[in-house]
Amino acid sequence: MHKVQFADVHFNAENTPVSAQFDDVYFSNQDGLAESHYIFQEGNQLWQRWQQTSEAHFVIAETGFGTGLNFFAVTQRFREFRLTYPDAPLKRLFFISFEKYPLPLAQLKRAHQAYPEFQSLAQQLQQSWLEPIVGCYRFHFAETTLDLWFGDMAENLPQLGDYMCNKIDAWFLDGFAPSKNPQMWQDTLYQHMYRYTKTQGTFSTFTAASAVRKGLIHAGFTVTKRKGYGKKRECLQGVKAQQQPADIHAPWALVQPAELTENADIALIGGGIASVFSALSLLERGAKVTVYCEDNSLAANASGNKQGAFYPQLSDDDLRYIRFYIHAFAYGKQRFNWAIEQGITFEHDFCGVALCAYDAKSAVKLAKISALQLPPSLYQPLSQQALSEQVGLPLPCDGGFIAQGAWLSPQQFVQNTFDFLATRGVIIKTQQKITALERQTTHWLLTTEQGDSFKHQVVVLANGHKLTQFRQTEHLPVYPVRGQVSEIATSTELSKLKAVICYDGYLTPKAASQTHCLGASHLRDNAERAFSLQEQQENQQKIQTNLASVDWVNEVDTRNNQARIGIRCSVRDRIPMLGNVPDFEQQLSDYHNLYNLRRRKHAIKHAALHPNLFLIGALGSRGLTSAPLLAETLASLIYHEPLPLSEDILHQLNANRSWIRKLLKGSQVKQG
């Protein structure tokens, strides 16, 4: 796992932060804010362009986040723009920034003291600051969204990927001076900038170095000099004047935004955790959202448990998936905290999650996690005694502890968040089973079991294990997984439990109902909802076998036969599916010879997709952790916005991945 190294920072006589890595100041000793405004805002003519654009959002990318000064300044300026021109088409600002060496929190706070006018923004950033791993973290600042990419920009910038071709409006070409940081100021940087910049998109920078100017010109930009700030004689600005076709490297995996009109009308099919987070993210973008749920009530299936564990999946041989779950976990915490701040009530406790090395196989798995050397705030290997102290009960083994993990009530969260969203305009229709989708010229026609029809511009499928019930999705390789969660009464000993325990199952601390959740069975290709005495007994046997040498497990008693059955949606590689619904037949026709087309470097068509039809599914048993970030990514895709995921992860989430993998190898894919 690529750890991110914090910056080595000291403060000079003017109290300006100085990087030891680059022996350079983070901003001007004289007036860093005025310099930022002159170089980047005036250099890119932001105020004028914001007034003139007909787009709903504007995208800025920055090389070097530093203290966040440029971000604070442009966020404040954009708020002034929105107040001055409330009826302008432009509603949202996206700020993408790259940082190899983030400041430690203490130094970040000290640097922010120089700019009290940004106190509110600075405090919000400080509260969100973390010990990051490589990749993208998304943060919301009202109408401005910050995508902060930690790690080496040479690795991260290409991960904006095919999707971001021709999408960036303006670049803040910042970072330490070229003479101090030559690794960044390379031709590859300018080439990526050009690839991602819109026609008539711009850049500005404080430097006028000849090598930088020549590199930008060679990449394709029209470059001009203007007066530098303060004592500096000159600085550079430029524009991508020529229209260029998108440079697409993996057309078979290219995702496509929706074709939207103003006040987009979007249908969400499903009433669980994926649906509620999708509704939230879409509503924030101004969509008219209608939710169709076939059950009598919301959260009636896999999202209906009384307690569920919230923590990242850290045990995988593919580091991409670990990165995904760590970023999803960080974003999920933001979303759950947002719900708490809004007064949405749901039982929860950020009590931590203990992972037990209960046998040889699990010990190897936890050893692999320890070898990742994750930040202790995320994961800490602990001895038997230390782990026992964290959970409040003796454990028979060593393990690991995720201090920021939690349990919460999925059922309460989903139902009460939908109630909240309904007060904000989301329309919720229960007992409405959609049985067919038909594409019309400008919309989708949804037909219900009762024979009613509804029209919507965009449809999002978030209906769990019933994802494949439509003609357009019947080829997706997902399957149902039955899970029975036992609800057991607490006891004198069990009531001492103060963290979630995971073994070959899990046990939660007691809820307000004085019960614990003990989970869970896992039966593939089984969608039965009836109570199973055998599974109830097996849930008890698992904990008493895995943690056999401690007495308190004998107080775990499932004989009350209280349980809840949910049907999860999963897929063989256990990775969620997200994005466009692929046109299976057309893709097989277009890509039957994909292996040779690629080998011979022939032109390859973009992946055939069902227009304005999207999905979020196959969340398995990790929906509490993955759904918030997946839903936010989906809403960003629908609205043609930057995505908070690296391309290597996004490709793995693509719903066509199973047959594309085969076709890329030259293997045959069966139809039907």
UniProtKB/Swiss-Prot annotation:
<dbReference type="GO" id="GO:0002098">
    <property type="term" value="P:tRNA wobble uridine modification"/>
</dbReference>
<keyword id="KW-0511">Multifunctional enzyme</keyword>
<dbReference type="InterPro" id="IPR023032">
    <property type="entry name" value="tRNA_MAMT_biosynth_bifunc_MnmC"/>
</dbReference>
<keyword id="KW-0963">Cytoplasm</keyword>
<dbReference type="GO" id="GO:0050660">
    <property type="term" value="F:flavin adenine dinucleotide binding"/>
</dbReference>
<dbReference type="Pfam" id="PF05430">
    <property type="entry name" value="Methyltransf_30"/>
</dbReference>
<comment type="similarity">
    <text>In the N-terminal section; belongs to the methyltransferase superfamily. tRNA (mnm(5)s(2)U34)-methyltransferase family.</text>
</comment>
<keyword id="KW-0808">Transferase</keyword>
<comment type="function">
    <text>Catalyzes the last two steps in the biosynthesis of 5-methylaminomethyl-2-thiouridine (mnm(5)s(2)U) at the wobble position (U34) in tRNA. Catalyzes the FAD-dependent demodification of cmnm(5)s(2)U34 to nm(5)s(2)U34, followed by the transfer of a methyl group from S-adenosyl-L-methionine to nm(5)s(2)U34, to form mnm(5)s(2)U34.</text>
</comment>
<dbReference type="GO" id="GO:0004808">
    <property type="term" value="F:tRNA (5-methylaminomethyl-2-thiouridylate)(34)-methyltransferase activity"/>
</dbReference>
<comment type="similarity">
    <text>In the C-terminal section; belongs to the DAO family.</text>
</comment>
<keyword id="KW-0489">Methyltransferase</keyword>
<feature type="region of interest" description="FAD-dependent cmnm(5)s(2)U34 oxidoreductase">
    <location>
        <begin position="269"/>
        <end position="672"/>
    </location>
</feature>
<dbReference type="InterPro" id="IPR017610">
    <property type="entry name" value="tRNA_S-uridine_synth_MnmC_C"/>
</dbReference>
<dbReference type="GO" id="GO:0032259">
    <property type="term" value="P:methylation"/>
</dbReference>
<feature type="region of interest" description="tRNA (mnm(5)s(2)U34)-methyltransferase">
    <location>
        <begin position="1"/>
        <end position="241"/>
    </location>
</feature>
<protein>
    <recommendedName>
        <fullName>tRNA 5-methylaminomethyl-2-thiouridine biosynthesis bifunctional protein MnmC</fullName>
        <ecNumber>2.1.1.61</ecNumber>
        <ecNumber>1.5.-.-</ecNumber>
    </recommendedName>
</protein>
<dbReference type="InterPro" id="IPR036188">
    <property type="entry name" value="FAD/NAD-bd_sf"/>
</dbReference>
<dbReference type="InterPro" id="IPR006076">
    <property type="entry name" value="FAD-dep_OxRdtase"/>
</dbReference>
<keyword id="KW-0949">S-adenosyl-L-methionine</keyword>
<dbReference type="GO" id="GO:0005737">
    <property type="term" value="C:cytoplasm"/>
</dbReference>
<dbReference type="InterPro" id="IPR029063">
    <property type="entry name" value="SAM-dependent_MTases_sf"/>
</dbReference>
<keyword id="KW-0560">Oxidoreductase</keyword>
<dbReference type="InterPro" id="IPR047785">
    <property type="entry name" value="tRNA_MNMC2"/>
</dbReference>
<keyword id="KW-0274">FAD</keyword>
<dbReference type="GO" id="GO:0016645">
    <property type="term" value="F:oxidoreductase activity, acting on the CH-NH group of donors"/>
</dbReference>
<keyword id="KW-0819">tRNA processing</keyword>
<dbReference type="Pfam" id="PF01266">
    <property type="entry name" value="DAO"/>
</dbReference>
<keyword id="KW-0285">Flavoprotein</keyword>
<dbReference type="InterPro" id="IPR008471">
    <property type="entry name" value="MnmC-like_methylTransf"/>
</dbReference>
